[in-house]
Amino acid sequence: MKVLFFSNKFPVEEHADLFQRIRQQSRSSRHAVLRQLLDECTAAVREEIRLLPAEIRTRLPPFQSILDLAEGFRWERSPLAGTFECVFLCLAELCLFVGDYEARPQAFKFTRSDSVFTGLGLGFLAATAIVASPTLIDVPATAADVIRIAMRAGLVVYHQGQNLEPQSLSAPLQSWTTLVKRLGEEAVQRELDCFNSAIPRPSQIYISVVEPDGSVFINGPPSIMRLLFSTPGPLQSAPRAPLPVYGGPCHAAHLYDRSHVSWIVKHVRSEIAWREFSDAAPLLSMADGQPLRAQTALELFESAAYVLLTGIIRWGNVLAALEEREDGAIQIESCGHSTPVEKLMRVLHAPTRDLTEWLSDEIEAVPGTHADCRIAVVGMSCRLPGADDLEHFWELLEQGRDVHQHVPPDRYDVQSHTDPTGRRMNTSQTPFGCFIDSPGLFDAGFFDMSPREAGQTDPTHRLALLTAYEALQQSGYIPDRTLSTIRETVATIYGQCSDDYREANAGQEIDMYFIPGNYRAFAPGRISYFFKFSGPSFSCDTACSASLAAVQIACATLSRGEANMVVAGGLNILTSSDSFAGLSRAHFLSKTGGCKVFDDGADGYCRADGVGSLVLKRLADAQRDNDNILGVILAAATNHSSAAVSITHPHAPTQEELYRNVLRQAGVSPLDVDLVEMHGTGTQAGDAAEIESVTRVFSPSRRSERLYIGSVKANLGHGEAAAGVTALIKALLIFQHNAIPKHVGIKTALNSRFPDLGQLNVHIPGETVPWSPRPNRKRYVMVNNFSAAGGNTALLLEEPPQRPTPGPACAQTRFVVTVSAKNPLSLRRNLERLMAFLRQHQPPVHLGSLAYTTTARRIHYPHRIAVQGASIADIIKHLELRLADLSLAHPQGAVARPPPIAFVFSGQGSFYPGISHDLLEHYPPYAREIHQLDALCLRHGFPSILPALTSSENSPSPLVTQLTTVCVQIALTHLWKSLAITPAVVIGASLGEYAALHATGALSASDTIFLVGQRGLLMQDLCTANTHTMLAVQATANEIAGCVPDSLSYEVACINSHRSITIAGTRSNITAIKASLESRGYRATELNVPYAFHSSHMDPILEKFNAIAQQATARALKVPLISPLLVDVLHEHTTLPASYLAEATRGRVRFSEALEKAHQATLITDQTVFVEIGIHPTYSNAVRSTVHNIAAVVPTLRSDQDNWHTLAGSMAALYEAAAGLDWNAWFEPFEPELRLLDLPRYAWNLKNHWIQHNGDWLLWKDKDRDRDNGKCMTHPDDGRGLYTPLLHRIVEETFWAGGGRVVMESNVHQEEFFAVASGHKMCGRPVVSVFSYPDMALSLARFVYTKVHPDISPPAMDFGNVHIFEGLIPHKDRSSPQWVRLQIKTTSVKHQLQVSFHRVGEDRVDQLATGTVSVGNAASWLSEWSGIAHLVSSRIKALQDLVHEGRADRLTRDTVYHLFRNSIVDYSPAYRGIQSAVIDGLEAVADVVLASSNMDRWTAPPHHVDSIAHVCGFVLNAGNAADHDNINTVYVMEGWRSMRFAKPLVSGRLYRSYVRMVPARDTGFFSGDVYVLDVAEDEVTGLLAGVTLRPLPRILMHRFFDPADDAHNWGNSPAKPEAKPEMVPTSGSSSAAGSPSGSSAGPLSIPERLADPSETSFQSKASKVSKALALIASETGIDMQDLNDETCLAQIGVDSLLSLVLVEKFALELGVHFPGSFFLDFPTVGEVKRQML
């Protein structure tokens, strides 16, 4: 006979070493069952940990295997040490048993006749897994359920211990068990009976183990155990030793019953639970030695758990039973040797086989195999050409759109960089591509980046952040919500294959963020850093298959357990012409347009942008987490076409083998695949090879079911590194929409090289094909992706598992819906989006799921709102009201940090039947708590509280009402704490002070119930009920005294607030007093209480109650307590005297005075949120009237509302106050009935951060070029370093310290210069626009600045004080040069440079214009203008409103330039930037889009500046104002006072120019300021101040603008001033406008003109602090107005790198020296200012 013994101790001392050896052996080929056991137990423990309270769950480390926890987690010292000992001891013994039976092949057969099982403690529980398993193969599943039972048993013991003697999670562990030797059981029991007589029953010490030698183990709360051994007597002197038993009380029949067992075995799977035993081996009870009675596995588990919880271990009984059963040869099997085993060996005279010996066996490793792990896609997002989200992507597919286009201006100049012949160096032969609109749009503030850093960061990195966030949001990701979302186990893997932005954009002017902003590794790294993911982070480059390869790596990472969640995708944004050139010259690209996939005329692919992100999890984890599963990746693989004719050529046999490999891994027949999403580039070689491989595998002959093929590249082009993820997202959308969209790649005819697809039943959808789920056949999609580098990647996608639709509602009847954002604008937009969604989907939206999604499955931000309702219509109504509140006048404020919470425990007050009925019936955590407390009541000998709660007892006794009130308060306290609402301070009134003391940790739940119950019994015995009562009065104490006759005595029992007093007295007196008060207009309410608490009515019980209170264990406060008795604050670590409760029973409750004292001590502040915990809010008004301006006061229960309604309102208020509610914990009981909704994505606050690629330097690289023929030529400046289209040669160059003089000459007839003039014609002649001068002056000024200060980058410059004297008109005869001379000189280049322009003839030099260039600060300008931007915007809006009213005109682009041509000037297309204009008199606004330009060759392109500025000329020359004559007069440029652009003008960007011209001081002259607004940035970025136009008779136009070649231009004009100004400018302006006048558009409120830059010099006007702020604003790109004392520097992009830069700048520019960590040590603007002051 076999005796199988399972011990209650580990077989070795070093637990970690044991589990390491088990792990090593599990890798052996012999131990497949062991591996399965570990996997099953891991899943079971994961599920149980998911159900733990957050405060415990978050203390556990992430783990992939249960062995990780057993080995690496120091569980022996954790608060749940006992719980984990249950788990790991059972696990160890089961692993040892299974491993032995695998390593030593033997019969797994245990019958009643040949085997018997027994065990001690937790080993007894482990034995049930073997007894309940018919075969060895059945053990893993059974063991997993037993492990869950063990964990739950440990938790039951832990919670019971907390009820008896609560311990904080960080407190040192204390032993609950002591071994006592020599005395024997009877003697110990006598001593315990004597000692326990003064101890409440649940807290009494008891015997848990009786050893055969007479030693006993005694158990009990550690503090009571210490008291026991400090009491003189035999136990004090007996030999004893505390044991490492920390979990709580076990083997305690007085503490546990069958209800605990039912919860422990609740989740046993039915297929295991109902296994029947017929001839199974018996399991002997460790209590009486008798076999457990069980017919099924469930009954066996229940019996074993009951014995474990309630039975005293008597090992002698087991030995005696075994001795009686001895029959023949006996062999003992056990895990290691121990004292019980040795006793077995002696009694049975039997040998022992050690089940640990196999751990030393040599390991035969398992051959590498593919891990059978299905991967779920749970979130996705994209930015694609023509589609900035998933919805638009599907619309694009459904509509069959082909979105290819010419390369847009924001990438590069397609005309100069394209040459279809390929003869020009480095040009592309195709102008086509597919592009994302505005790829620079980004919410920098959300991701804690400064505008400066955002601009320097590759847009693929930024869009990766945006799409990763959106995919995570769709997945319902909350950091650390579940084991699979623990941040330490999340990986990021992205495919990338180019560096366009780094090479063509950011590289033009390298800044501090060049490296982290552009190198590929930083894209996934930045995502990991922002979200604080600590898992692997990879950037993958396999060329065109990079993103699908990244997904494959992600799947492998998940399968191997290296991560629990992966964010993966692909990135591609095209900005460099080099790749276009290289690919087109290698014949990859189509010269005729998009990808013509499957077309007979396919001539190559069309390049495309693309950014896509996916969130991946193991399928089991996704289902456990209640995620939405979009699709399931069954298998993925990659191979390489090494047998191809060249590295870039596809190879059909290799692709074919790849498909077969993937299908083998997935276990799916190729004939079951319905759709192949092909790579499909539209190249002849690629399409033919791919169709060959696809048909050979999926349709080698005609198949019965249709096979559809398609390729997304026909719609979107080839996204290269993003191609694979784009195709995968398309496949997922197909599952989502149950339709296969039409293929649009065939433009002429099907590729003639294809086989007969119809014969093979292979179809290319010409229209959208419905494809709905089928009940008996799953849908599969093969996604194929190959690479120009030879790689092939494919994956098989299965449709998502079907889930039942949730019912109409879960148990809750009212729900909270939340909306939040990082800024007010996004909050408003998020709110609008949610409302639009609800209106659109109102009938099908499940209210519970909506609440669950917006609360438990959303990351929450400081700007937030919460509404509650009982229906979707309710929610919409409340959202509409909140949206109305979010006006500009009342923006929603942000709460920076969670508020302190104060718990207020009210007294007995208004008891009513059915208290907390809804929670008790439908919220299991609360019900479980109430039942535990009810069990404590019964164990103390008090009546049950359940009848009073379930409405079955209408008139409960005073004892029951008091017990019920306190138990409900304790349960509600635990409920709030489970939701992460924990108190910073506690106050209790009257009876509520008992629950308050429990909340502070001063009383255990058991002691609290004991004291309340004993007090209630004393009242029943010693106080006559209903002879006295209490009266609540709304008056002051003095007012009450003034209304009560002297003959009527009363006592003031409670001072709740200044005007809320409760008095006590005899019932007759109180009745009379009530009548007296009411007759004088005071409100008085008699309380429904049988006794007059806090009065002399309590005197009879005080002495006895004080004696009883000594029996409770006094503990130090863990939370500050506000004492209404002492009118004081008792801080942590204070221990209350035992007499406190008796004194509180009799003493006056001075609630308001105590609150005021706490307020004065700042323990309560204006930010404190009060949570009243009681059966009805009786003290909320007292709190409000005592502490003014508090954040919120919320109730927990109300007698006039159902529980859901009250809690919803309170949780909404707490949420808006920024309390950190654990919504996941709240919804956990309901989660199976709820679904994660696909709600609208976050509304970003997008601004365009984009460095425009300028010029054509990518074409000529290190070679000079002649734009006409591409040949090299030498610059006319003879290598002196400056050559632009308008500056040709240096004729004089002199420099000295700080200054210099340079003279340059330019040939007006040179082709580029002449082209500038030709775009601006007057009277049919080219005329050099005066806005050519800014480019010439600023280019030369920058050159001079660089020469004088070669180590300093040129700053922003203001070209002002400009006076135009004559026009510059090219000669008709261009056979000889026509020279214009520019002179610039300065004595201090850092301040001002004088500029003059001259026409140079053979015998004369004529002055054309003069001006100055002043050095400025762009950031200061932006700050300056931000203060007036709203005024400009208001005028623009007023003009636009006039259009709608029909009182102003909106002119189209064609109309504007038609009027210009008829009035004064004919502009070429390059100058025609105005897209539309609104004009009203002398006021106008124009929308301007600048033409493309090679920006690296210009400083201020004339056609850009002219486009921005000529709205002022249009107003005067072509406008409709009545106060000037534009019929007989034309207006030409006289000059301007200042021209400043804080940011470069960008081709393709939308600007808005606003001007109002007014008469100037000189008669006929008009002046105005042109404000330039960047529409995308919504800010003023440029200003032409004091622009002045002078009148010229129209009749003289031909004289001045069509002269002979030797004539002057308007030099003899009668309107010309007689005296020319000198070169040195004056500080004032000669063309300041007069006072503003009225307008039909409303009063004009334009700010005063900005002063001259020399007057507003930043250095001379600002203090050091304001200089410092300006520097911070400049370096981060933040507006000065956005910097306030609360601004967090890290959130505007001041990281460690920028911190060092600012420290250096402070030292250089301010003379202030700080350490490198200064901005990290002082992280807000306010702190920086204080340090500087």
From Swiss-Prot:
Residues 406-429, 1608-1659 are annotated as: Disordered. Keywords: Acyltransferase, Phosphopantetheine, Phosphoprotein, Transferase. Residues 406-422 have a biased composition (Basic and acidic residues). The keyword Lipoprotein does not apply. The active site is at 544 (for beta-ketoacyl synthase activity), 679 (for beta-ketoacyl synthase activity), 718 (for beta-ketoacyl synthase activity), 1320 (proton acceptor), 1506 (proton donor). Residues 1448-1598 are annotated as: C-terminal hotdog fold. GO terms for molecular function: fatty acid synthase activity. Residues 21-358 are annotated as: N-terminal acylcarrier protein transacylase domain (SAT). Binds 1 phosphopantetheine covalently. CDD domains: PKS (cd00833). Residues 1299-1594 are annotated as: Product template (PT) domain. Pfam families: Acyl_transf_1 (PF00698), CurL-like_PKS_C (PF22621), ketoacyl-synt (PF00109), Ketoacyl-synt_C (PF02801), PP-binding (PF00550), SAT (PF16073). The keyword Transferase applies. Residues 1288-1598 form the PKS/mFAS DH domain. Its cofactor is pantetheine 4'-phosphate. InterPro entries: Ac_transferase_dom_sf, ACP-like_sf, Acyl_transferase_dom, Acyl_Trfase/lysoPLipase, Ketoacyl_synth_C, Ketoacyl_synth_N, Malonyl_transacylase_ACP-bd, PKS_Beta-ketoAc_synthase_dom. The modification O-(pantetheine 4'-phosphoryl)serine is found at residue 1696. Residues 903-1211 are annotated as: Malonyl-CoA:ACP transacylase (MAT) domain. Residues 372-799 form the Ketosynthase family 3 (KS3) domain. Residues 1288-1420 are annotated as: N-terminal hotdog fold. One of its GO terms (biological process) is secondary metabolite biosynthetic process. PANTHER family: FATTY ACID SYNTHASE, SI:DKEY-61P9.11. Non-reducing polyketide synthase; part of the gene cluster that mediates the biosynthesis of the bicoumarin desertorin. The non-reducing polyketide synthase desS first catalyzes the formation of the pentaketidic 4,7-dihydroxy-5-methylcoumarin from acetyl coenzyme A and 4 malonyl coenzyme A molecules. Further O-methylation by desB leads to the formation of 7-demethylsiderin. Then, an oxidative phenol coupling catalyzed by the cytochrome P450 monooxygenase desC forms the 6,8'-dimer M-desertorin A via dimerization the monomeric precursor, 7-demethylsiderin. This is Desertorin synthase. It comes from Aspergillus desertorum (Emericella desertorum). The lineage of its organism: Eukaryota, Fungi, Dikarya, Ascomycota, Pezizomycotina.
